[in-house]
Structure formats: C-alpha cells, structure tokens
Amino acid sequence: SGSCEFKTCWKAMPPFRKVGNVLKEKFDGATEVEQSEIGSTKVLVPKNSQFKPHTDEDLVYLDSSPDFCDHDLKNGVLGTSGRQCNKTSKAIDGCELMCCGRGFHTDEVEVVERCSCKF
C-alpha cells in the first residue's frame, strides 16, 4: 500500500486592495515622456529633463489628461461645476478637490423620512 503525495502550484493575484494601492502609487509617480530618436532607435525620454529616466516598472504617458474641472465636450468632459460635494471629505468627493479651487456654496438640507419607529 503505497501513498502518493501531490503538490500543485498555481499563480494567484494578491488582494485587490494591494493591487489598487500599487497602481495608485505608480499613477501618482508617472512620468510624462516624449518620443526621441537615438540613432535609428526610437526611445521614450522624460519631457522634463530634470526628471530621472523611467524604468521598465514605471508608468509613463505621452499626452496629459484633460482638465476635468472645466466643461469640454470635445474631450467628453462635463466639468465639475454644479456637482454635489462632501464638505468634510479630503478624498475625490471633497469640495476642495472637486471644485478645483473655484470655491463652493454650502446649502443645508433637511430630509424628512418616514420610519417604522415604535416608542
């Protein structure tokens, strides 16, 4: 009576949050590049010569993102004017970030809801 032991290996993704954090970090440190020719070879070099050359692990981009603050139908951007924001948030839904430094108006709204309260 012989027994066999099998080992099975497979690749697995790290937790989604960890992947997101790494991508966000890379996005925040992305370098704007332009195409240049060295001899007959085309290479990507930083648009700003004060930045260090990128590595194969870095994110790079050729074109800047549109300004999402202002209305620009050509690029499909609706802008942020008139949107509702969270006055206390420092995240993307916060008024400081969403209103792009234009300032914002604060409205106090009272919401009345029916509930099944028992006293």
From Swiss-Prot:
Cysteine disulfide links: C69-C100, C85-C95
Record's keyword terms, sorted: Developmental protein, Disulfide bond, Extracellular matrix, Glycoprotein, Lipoprotein, Secreted, Wnt signaling pathway
Keyword Lipoprotein: yes
Protein modification: Palmitoleoylation is required for efficient binding to frizzled receptors. Depalmitoleoylation leads to Wnt signaling pathway inhibition.
GO BP terms, alphabetized: canonical Wnt signaling pathway; cell fate commitment; neuron differentiation
Primary location: secreted
Pfam families: wnt
Positions where lipid (O-palmitoleoyl serine) attaches: S1
Family under the similarity heading: Belongs to the Wnt family.
Cited function: Ligand for members of the frizzled family of seven transmembrane receptors. Plays an important role in embryonic development.
Name of the protein: Protein Wnt-4
Organism: Meleagris gallopavo (Wild turkey)
